[in-house]
């Protein structure tokens, strides 16, 4: 990759965020992973509000990886909010959740999610998810 693509990771699991970062490196990709803990922080980040006002430090992401079940605001709340923001509608949102319930997958798509991946059980699964994300949304992995 010639430039560091900003990817917003919205997830309350530091272990999953770590495994995602490691999987991107193992795939030969080094995007700029920007991590926020919940939907409320994601809305602040995307709006450029509170501590995220400086767009040179906090650029709009080229892709967002969004968990569903989080404190304060969940992923579905973020998707509903995004529907009201035409200026942010072009950011692809990939759901990355531990939920494999078909109802959650369908709800995410109805609310505008671009894709949906279930969180894998181990590091090798994260490698596969990242390769799929890279193939669809980023430069090709090694």
Specify the residue positions occupied by each region the protein language model found.
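Conserved acidic segment of CheY-like receiver
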Residues: 5-15, 20-25, 33, 64
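Acidic, metal-coordinating helix/loop segments flanking the phosphotransfer/catalytic sites
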Residues: 21, 35-63
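Residue-level signal for the "D+5" position in two-component response regulator receiver
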Residues: 35, 72-73, 110
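C-terminal output helix
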Residues: 41, 121-133
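Hydrophobic/aromatic residues positioned on beta-strands within the core alpha/beta folds
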Residues: 94-96
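Short, glycine/charged-rich "phosphate-handling" switch motifs in NTP-dependent
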Residues: 114
């Amino acid at each position: 990759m010639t430039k560091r693509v900003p990817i917003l990771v919205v997830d309350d699991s530091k272990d999953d965020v770590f495994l995602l970062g490691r999987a991107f490196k193992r795939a030969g990709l080094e995007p700029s992973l920007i991590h926020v803990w919940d939907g409320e922080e994601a809305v602040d980040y995307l709006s450029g509000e509170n501590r995220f006002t400086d767009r040179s430090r906090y650029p709009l992401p080229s892709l967002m990886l969004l968990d569903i079940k989080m404190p304060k605001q969940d992923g579905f709340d973020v998707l509903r909010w995004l529907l009201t923001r035409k200026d942010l509608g072009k950011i692809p949102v990939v759901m990355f959740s531990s939920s494999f319930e078909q109802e959650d997958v369908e709800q995410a798509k109805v609310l505008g999610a671009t894709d949906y991946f279930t969180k894998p059980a181990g590091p090798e699964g994260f490698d596969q998810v990242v390769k799929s994300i890279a193939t669809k949304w980023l430069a090709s992995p090694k």
